[in-house]
């Protein structure tokens, strides 16, 4: 039914779109925690299940790797000039989240019809750089509660982001340091896995 809108990219398969359907598949549950398979759990994530989402439909962590790369205009972004946040409706790069860990408030997602919303956004944009993540960021950009970075510590951050102070806020730099010292989840983003 959806094959004509799902496309693969680089090392991303069509499985990346499965998270769009979580509110529909798990409609009998109040809350679902979605985690990518390339995550290492260092702490008990049960505390995430009961966190107050402050009325938001989802919770996630900011994608510091994307934020840093975008601000620096790194080689990755130069190769992918078509990835223009303004053009695809991302209002604030500072609020762009990583979709590797998402806490879904199922009732709120159903209320805003998030499944249809995500599918309609995907139909509109057929060449997104990070298709699933970009769609989720467009769909939920005003409806996300941001978790501390320790819950999605991207393992490449301290290696790739050598000039953090030039491109990231002091608050984000402090969160990166805290997350590195005491991670709840380590996320092995990128093609390189342990």
Could you say what each language-model-derived stretch is?
Residues 1-194:
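Glycosyltransferase catalytic domains, chiefly GT-A lineage
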